[in-house]
UniProtKB/Swiss-Prot annotation:
Primary role: This reaction introduces a second double bond into the aromatic ring system.
Annotated organism of origin: Brucella canis (strain ATCC 23365 / NCTC 10854 / RM-666)
Gene name of this polypeptide: aroC
Name of the protein: Chorismate synthase
Pathway of action: Metabolic intermediate biosynthesis; chorismate biosynthesis; chorismate from D-erythrose 4-phosphate and phosphoenolpyruvate: step 7/7
InterPro entries: Chorismate_synth, Chorismate_synth_AroC_sf, Chorismate_synthase_CS
Length: 364
């Protein structure tokens, strides 16, 4: 199986399966001299880890990260400094229950990658989906924690903006609310609505999708490239690689098709500091594939997980018709834990383009 790596200069390779002994990543191309602690990486992993509320899978994984290479440990025994060599990180699996998947070892779960993996490779890991499981994304979150350190002044934040047909009220957007509720939503008024809705979904053994918005501030103007090396192109590609993601927008996205040229174009003026400013940000911080210095804004849609208790019609490896009901522990809305994953992937894309821009122009 190939295609386990992404990035050009800031290159990340992930490894491991949902029910294996461990999973992890290797970050290659990280500049030397960047300092961080395992606790900083852990803070992002804790946001993604399962079992934190009744609205996520009850699989209990501490997701404790270990940095194995590519750093020098400081005299304080805590601070690590990158050496410029590959940074390897590992997260052990401690709460896998493969017996839950015995019934579907030969059955194809509707909506999952079971059949696609089997038809391509002639073999699949039925225990939680193997590499196709969202468990793999823990390694991406660890890599994203490093990526945030590569670009000085970069801040990447994410929030859940809709669950099913329920949208937040954007007039109540407050970033301070995101970490104060189990849905990572910036609208405190939507928390009770989301909770009541997901309670019903969860009790019925069903699932629902979500939309997540990522905002990156402090992105240097000029990074990115025209045509085939666009910053927004790579952000979209990185986000589409996340399990269950079915759509990505940059800036106004599909809504731009409903606007006139006067409504959509971002007008400019000179700011008080003598630097250009945009009077709006319909473009989402990218024009011609190159960052403008405005916040980079992306949204991605996550489908409902196909692991539900409702019996669904399918076939097995022998072509027999079967009804499949997925047991085990699953998220009623995988979009909740996709928030830190989306943040990580956007951070990795920006870090890669930052290094590419520096290498090509000598400027940042």
């Amino acid at each position: 199986m190939s295609h386990n790596s992404f990035g050009h200069l800031f290159r990340v390779t992930t490894w491991g399966e949902s029910h294996g002994l461990a999973l992890g990543c290797v970050v290659d191309g990280c500049p030397p001299g960047i300092t961080f602690t395992e606790a900083e990486i852990q803070s992002f992993l804790d946001k993604r880890k399962p079992g934190q509320s009744k609205y996520t899978t009850q699989r209990r994984e501490p997701d404790q990260v270990r940095v194995l290479s590519g750093v020098l440990l400081g005299e304080d025994g805590v601070t690590m400094t990158t050496t410029g060599t590959p940074i390897s990180m590992m997260i052990e699996n401690t709460d896998q229950r493969s017996k839950d998947y015995g019934e579907i070892a030969r059955q194809y779960r509707p909506g999952h990658a079971d059949y696609a993996y089997d038809v391509k490779y002639g073999i699949r890991d039925y225990r939680g989906g193997g590499r196709s499981s969202a468990r793999e994304t823990a390694a991406r979150v660890a890599a994203g924690a490093i990526a945030r350190k590569v670009v000085p002044g970069l801040e990447v934040r994410g929030a859940l903006v809709s669950i099913g047909a329920h949208d937040i009220d954007r007039s109540r957007w407050n970033w301070a609310e995101v970490d104060n509720n189990p849905f990572f939503t910036p609208d405190a008024g939507s928390v009770e609505v989301f909770a009541d809705y997901l309670d019903g979904i969860r009790k019925n053994g069903s699932s629902v999708g979500a939309i997540i918005e990522i905002v990156a501030e402090g992105v240097p103007a000029g990074i990115g490239a025209p045509i085939y090396g666009k910053l927004d192109q790579d952000i979209a590609s990185y986000l589409m690689s996340i399990n269950a993601v079915k759509g990505v927008e940059i800036g106004n996205g599909f809504e731009a098709a409903r606007l006139t040229g006067e409504e959509n174009a971002d007008e400019m003026r000179m700011g008080n500091d003598g630097k250009p400013i945009f009077l709006s940000n319909h473009a989402g911080g990218v024009l011609g594939g190159i960052a403008t210095g405005a916040p980079v804004v992306a949204r991605f849609a996550v489908k409902p997980t196909s692991s539900i208790l409702t019996p669904r019609r399918s076939i097995d490896k022998d072509g027999n018709e079967v009804d499949v009901m997925t047991r085990g522990r699953h998220d009623p809305c995988v979009g909740i834990r996709a928030v830190p994953i989306g943040e990580a992937m956007v951070a990795c894309a920006i870090a890669d383009h930052y290094l590419r821009h520096r290498g090509q122009t000598g400027r940042v």
